[in-house]
Curated annotation (Swiss-Prot):
Alphabetical list of Gene3D superfamilies matching this protein: YehU-like
Cross-referenced NCBIfam families: PRK04966.1
Family statement drawn from the similarity comment of this UniProt entry: Belongs to the UPF0270 family.
Protein name (record): UPF0270 protein plu0398
Highest taxon, organism lineage: Bacteria
Signal peptide: none
Family annotation (SUPFAM superfamilies): YehU-like
Originating organism: Photorhabdus laumondii subsp. laumondii (strain DSM 15139 / CIP 105565 / TT01)
Amino acid sequence: MIIPWQQLEPETLLNLIESFVLREGTDYGEDEKSLEQKVANIRHQLERGDVMLVWSELHESVNIVPKEMFHS
């Protein structure tokens, strides 16, 4: 199920994004980014609609996925 990120409390959204960034360990190449930069990057992707928050009933967890990977 898609979760509209705009409906979340700002602190909840921040916690979800931080958890995702720390869990994924995204590779940014030679220029390592700070946690704040990575969080801002994911937030911008949410705002642009490039990624979305998805609730998995099977895993009882929220994940951030590229919109192309989610088939509604």
